[in-house]
Curated annotation (Swiss-Prot):
Cofactor note: Binds 4 [4Fe-4S] clusters per heterotetramer. Contains two stable clusters in the N-termini of Nubp1 and two labile, bridging clusters between subunits of the Nubp1-Nubp2 heterotetramer.
Residues involved in [4Fe-4S] cluster binding: 188, 191
Name of the protein described by the UniProt record: Cytosolic Fe-S cluster assembly factor Nubp2 homolog
Gene that encodes it: Nubp2
GO cellular component: cytosol
Keyword Metal-binding recorded: yes
């Protein structure tokens, strides 16, 4: 049930392992930290990371007359979370389902969760372009989906997959809000200097190619990794970091193009 949700943002990636779930989680925390009521929906059925990233593993979800009740991370209920990870007994349990069952579960996540009034719903999707993505796009045609943010790394093989993701979005009619380049350089945890490990600026060039905004470049920062398993926002814990700067800019960009009043 998305009738109380003002804005829906889908987070996509062309391939796995690019940090999409970390970006989704920290974006949700940054939006909450700046005063918004936020929902985070993890529909990466085969690799749900959000419960681990927020330290919510082992949480039980319940049903009410209106559907599933999400897990809230705080007493003020400013961040609500739903993930298939809450339905698994163990984090290592595989989800061995055929396409139709995955499709049914995604539809349930998008229609049967009792979200209260939200300024933003962030949807963390599986990597690639598959049946799951088609199901998401079909369901979101009935609600005001603002568009998609694509997360990539600067390497050529990742960028090739992102080109497919861009084509997929155009063919399914979802607006592209921009590209975030992740893992661009390594931040030394001692001196905070940044050293390139892979190639750089691939996301910038791809944004130019696709004529969509480049929303920021994030380095590999071990200090951010330490926050995994907590509900701590980079904006609070590392306010002077490059990651915090990019997230603040991303929040401002979303606020400028969405309805949050």
């Amino acid at each position: 049930m998305l009738d109380k949700v003002k804005n829906v943002i889908v987070v996509l990636s062309g391939k796995g392992g690019v940090g999409k779930s970390t970006v989704s989680t920290q974006l949700a925390l940054a939006l909450r930290q700046t005063g918004h009521k936020v929902g985070l929906l993890d529909i990466d059925l085969c690799g749900p990371s959000v419960p681990y990233l927020l330290g919510l593993e082992g949480s039980d979800i319940f049903q009410c007359d209106e559907g599933w009740v999400p897990i809230y991370t705080d007493e003020s209920q400013t961040l609500a979370v739903m993930s298939i990870g809450f339905l698994l007994k163990n984090r290592t349990d595989p989800v061995i389902w055929r396409g139709p069952k995955k499709t049914m579960m995604i539809r349930q996540f998008l229609t049967d969760v009792k979200w209260d009034e939200l300024d933003y719903l962030i949807i963390d999707t599986p990597p690639g372009t598959s049946d799951e993505h088609i199901t998401v796009m079909e369901c979101l045609r009935e609600v005001p989906c603002n568009g998609a943010i694509i997360v990539t790394t600067p390497q050529g093989v990742a960028l090739d997959d992102v080109r497919k993701e861009i084509t997929f979005c155009k063919k399914t009619g979802i607006k592209l809000l921009g590209i975030v380049e992740n893992m661009s350089g390594f931040v030394c945890p001692h001196c905070t200097s940044c050293t390139n490990i892979f190639s750089s600026n691939g996301g910038v060039e791809l944004a130019k190619y696709a004529q969509i905004p480049h929303l920021g470049t994030l380095p590999i920062d071990p200090r951010v990794g330490v926050l995994a398993g907590t509900t701590a926002s980079v904006l609070d814990e590392l306010p002077d970091s490059t990651t915090a700067e990019v997230l603040r800019g991303l929040v401002q960009h979303l606020d400028s193009i969405t309805l949050t009043a």
